[in-house]
Amino acid sequence: MNYDNYWDEDKPELNITPLVDVMLVLLAILMVTTPTLTYKEEIALPSGSKTARATQDKMIEIRMDKDAKIYIDSQTYEYNSFPDTFNLLSKKYDKDTRVSIRADKRLTYDKVIYLLKTIKEAGFLKVSLITSP
């Protein structure tokens, strides 16, 4: 009897498919959990002041009624003289101040555009229209 042939035929083969499957699952878990780890690094942040935040929160609200009268706070302005008056008034404010316009829905489109153009010409960059449902 030839023993060499016997052992050659019955050699066990190593099936690596389950091993690869397990390794791929572990790799996927590692890739998902790695970004969630937090690293603690000492970072020296600059100190800020609270006054800078308070000045940014300032806003000018301009209201225009159906008769084209313009209101800023408690002051009333006429439609035709508003550009000159607003240019003088705008010198008190920083040009980065937010300006909100609340116009009556019965106004014509031209009057609201005129108001927007006046505010933009005064140098204000952050102008928005307020609408209500």
Curated annotation (Swiss-Prot):
It comes from the Bacteria. InterPro entries: ExbD (IPR003400). Disulfide bonds: none annotated. Keywords: Cell inner membrane, Cell membrane, Membrane, Protein transport, Transmembrane, Transmembrane helix, Transport. GO terms for biological process: protein transport. It is a single-pass type II membrane protein. One of its GO terms (molecular function) is transmembrane transporter activity. GO terms for cellular component: plasma membrane. Residues 33-133 are periplasmic. The chain crosses the membrane at residues 16-32. Residues 1-15 are cytoplasmic. It is found in: Cell inner membrane. The keyword Cell inner membrane applies. Its main location: membrane. Belongs to the ExbD/TolR family. This is Putative biopolymer transport protein ExbD-like 1. It comes from Helicobacter pylori (strain ATCC 700392 / 26695) (Campylobacter pylori). The lineage of its organism: Bacteria, Pseudomonadati, Campylobacterota, Epsilonproteobacteria, Campylobacterales.
